[in-house]
């Protein structure tokens, strides 16, 4: 891994040390720049345009070289707005790709695609920077062990477990609890694994990014008093940014995560919201550069761009990056090239259900729709696998019986089916869990439930040991012992009322 230890010296003019070119043409966010013969920049080099516009306002635009056109001209894509630029303005070749600050100084801060802080909390220590373009780890460095990444969230660990160093797709509409689930995962990785998280906001609404930041401060994921104790770094390239910024912001977030993995040797969670917007931005840039479009108007390099990003997200012998990517499915068409290309890289999917959220069951993870390649007996063990399969079968049977119950009522079912329904309702409620980050809103203390405890709890429910307990005893509790204690309390309360 290449880390640049750079010390900025404002006294030395950049122009004295770097190649200088001039803007020859401007088409929206695309610039053509002419350089002297023999002084051409490399592909992906950063170019900086500094000067003043016609009103005397200062201009500072960073671009990235995308094409060498011949005749000593290059074509570059701007990372910020190009208003005020004119032909003939000086352009400085920085001699290397975009580099962003990495390390502990990034925690608790919000950055843009260039690694500049945008939260008005002052400058960031930029002595340690890293280029956003680099190769994926070599085969020899990879950790080939298949191990589960324990999240402490019952429904995830039991039914759709995450792989350490894997990639997880997070599917869910607005208002079903994506943000709260993301914040709980950030909180749990910090407490249970001593890890940190990086959140990449790629082409989503600025309002959502602001809401997430405020909620993180409120729940303690970001510590305003002592930023070093924060558990997350945020990188935003929202939907009002030029396509160049939206295309590269995912790489900026990934570069920060790689430093924590490779240098600090930590387990890292990388959130990308939304991976579809990364593809969408690549499609816009491809059209601006004049490339022939491929299927459904997407860029011909779609698979390559996705592979370049996804292959860097992996486990090495030093640490791991586990990535959770929100996936927008355009027009709910799973065969669209963007989601279809994403699915090829995913190890697990976590699907959030509006129906469960409406019932008040949080996290509203759909136990039947969520999947994982890790749920195999040789990886998770026979006990875990059998318990998960029995839970799914019980819930599936309950789902099939719901129409009959709605029309004829519960009394018309056979004894066996009534028992299945009762257990399924207990399981459904036991899959809910109080979150640490939601303590502020709910008043219930959060619970981290280990995998062994989770399996034990569901086995006991399936065995019929708790058939006599009321189903509300299983709602929003941690392990099974809390459910039995809650049942005792409920019984005492009902006796007192009588």
From Swiss-Prot:
Upper taxonomic lineage: Eukaryota, Viridiplantae, Streptophyta, Embryophyta, Tracheophyta
Protein name (database record): ATP synthase subunit beta, chloroplastic
Disulphide bridges, residue numbers: none
Domain of life: Eukaryota
Function: Produces ATP from ADP in the presence of a proton gradient across the membrane. The catalytic sites are hosted primarily by the beta subunits.
A GO cellular-component term linked to this record: chloroplast thylakoid membrane
Subunit organization: F-type ATPases have 2 components, CF(1) - the catalytic core - and CF(0) - the membrane proton channel. CF(1) has five subunits: alpha(3), beta(3), gamma(1), delta(1), epsilon(1). CF(0) has four main subunits: a(1), b(1), b'(1) and c(9-12).
Family listed: Belongs to the ATPase alpha/beta chains family.
UniProt-annotated location(s): Plastid, Chloroplast thylakoid membrane
Chief place where the protein resides: plastid
Keywords noted in UniProt: ATP synthesis, ATP-binding, CF(1), Chloroplast, Hydrogen ion transport, Ion transport, Membrane, Nucleotide-binding, Phosphoprotein, Plastid, Thylakoid, Translocase, Transport
Phosphoserine: residues bearing it: 13
One of the GO biological process terms: proton motive force-driven mitochondrial ATP synthesis
Amino-acid positions noted as binding ATP in the UniProt annotation, renumbered to this chain: 172-179
EC number: 7.1.2.2
Bilayer topology: Peripheral membrane protein
Primary gene name: atpB
GO terms assigned for molecular function: ATP binding; ATP hydrolysis activity; proton-transporting ATP synthase activity, rotational mechanism
Post-translational modification Phosphothreonine, affected residues: 6
Catalysed reactions, as listed in the record: ATP + H2O + 4 H(+)(in) = ADP + phosphate + 5 H(+)(out)
